[in-house]
Amino acid sequence: MEGNLLVIDKRVLPEVFEKVINAKRLLKEGKVKEITEAAKQAGISRSVYYKYKDYIFEFAETLQGRKVIFNMVVTHEKGVLSSVLNILSDVGGNILTIDQGLPIHGLAHVSFTIDISTMKCDIKEMLNEIELVHGVEKVEFVAME
């Protein structure tokens, strides 16, 4: 099977997944201010919330504009960041933010936030392609909202 994403009827999943969605909803709607409070009201532990929060989404959320955050470590060489930007453009990702640290010992940390609602491929394919760029040492998925 290709990809990591599935659409599953919640009736066949453990109740904990719906509780995580409930905690996320409480935070999103401003009904609670802290994760501890949201987890308590949803009937889950904070560790359960943190374990699943970046992997569980309501179906309606997946149809809206989505954002992905990922980090990279790149070598301090001419053209590396440009190559990554070209890949993001080619797959239809819309760059929202780029944050690059100063190179230390020849390596720089770069963080991207991109809108993936118009992308032509899935996130895993995009990250795999970026990982193949000469000068990209590490690519790490951080979060999706």
From Swiss-Prot:
CDD domains associated with the record: ACT_PheB-BS
InterPro entries in the cross-refs: ACT-like_dom_sf, ACT_dom, UPF0735_ACT_dom-cont
TM segment ranges: none
Domain ACT: from-to ranges: 69-144
Top-level lineage group: Bacteria
Signal peptide range in chain numbering: none
Family: Belongs to the UPF0735 family.
Name this protein carries in UniProt: UPF0735 ACT domain-containing protein CPE1414
Organism: Clostridium perfringens (strain 13 / Type A)
